[in-house]
């Protein structure tokens, strides 16, 4: 399949005039949600969310990895910043808005998961309408391992996995 539009961190493929495939394409970070990737996704969604001809969007990761969650290099830089609270709030809010936007799209969204869907990547999977998951795919709320709560993604995880399963995931990270 030929790339129709290549951004820095995502690639867009038109399957036909009514379906678009989005590929997270930053293998060096295991398709982490960088500020740049989030902006690219939002810019792309700006272009298609009101397009009546597009009936569906599939999301997948490149190189056998769906999405590893927030970009830890950027998170580390936030804590080194002079105003870390403001920067942390900005990235957290942008991830939250992206998840809400994916869930609210008028088009059908299908998440095709190979490899791992970690933290925010798992949240993106849960925000979609339908998930197609490879039998060897792995899921984890890795932020809980470092003492963070999965606050932005928890509504989507609870809706998709149910309260009891979501609670277990949020406590054990597995």
Language-model regions, residue ranges each:
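Conserved CoA-thioester-binding segment of acyl-CoA-metabolizing enzymes
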Residues: 1-62, 100
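A short, glycine- and basic residue-enriched loop/turn
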Residues: 27-30, 64, 69, 116, ...
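Residues at secondary-structure transition points
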Residues: 28, 32, 39, 82-93, ...
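Nucleotide phosphate-binding site architecture
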Residues: 30-31, 73-76, 140, 167
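Hydrophobic/aromatic residues within transmembrane alpha-helices
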Residues: 59, 71, 124-126
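Glycine- (often His-adjacent) and acidic-residue-rich active-site loop
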Residues: 61-97
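Crotonase-fold acyl-CoA enzyme core
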Residues: 100-174
